[in-house]
């Protein structure tokens, strides 16, 4: 799941799968969208884990973890330089406007 300010969570999603694994990707605008989509995926698709983009704050990760108590909640974070590079790229793209 990734924060994308100009997305439509109901439209901006995809599923990749093999015979043994299903991987769902969903863009969300904010924490409200994230909670709604995550609960929907747990109930309708039976997800067992979720991977969040680095844009989720520790507080948001905690809230998702509390809400999805039976789902593993993980965050894809890089090292210090990677975070800075990603932040600069997002700023150039107008992410924070």
Give, region by region, the residue ranges found by the protein language model:
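N-terminal basic/disordered segments at the start of proteins
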Residues: 1-8
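Short, charged, surface-exposed secondary-structure boundary motifs
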Residues: 81-88
């Amino acid at each position: 799941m990734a924060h994308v300010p100009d997305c439509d969570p109901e439209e901006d999603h995809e599923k990749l799968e093999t015979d043994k694994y299903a991987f769902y990707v969903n863009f969300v605008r904010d924490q409200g969208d994230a909670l709604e989509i995550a609960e929907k995926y747990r109930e309708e698709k039976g997800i067992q884990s979720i991977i969040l983009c680095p844009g989720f704050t520790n507080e948001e990760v905690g809230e998702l973890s509390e809400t999805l108590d039976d789902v593993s909640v993980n965050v894809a974070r890089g090292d210090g330089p990677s975070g800075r590079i990603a932040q600069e790229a997002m700023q150039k793209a107008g992410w924070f406007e």
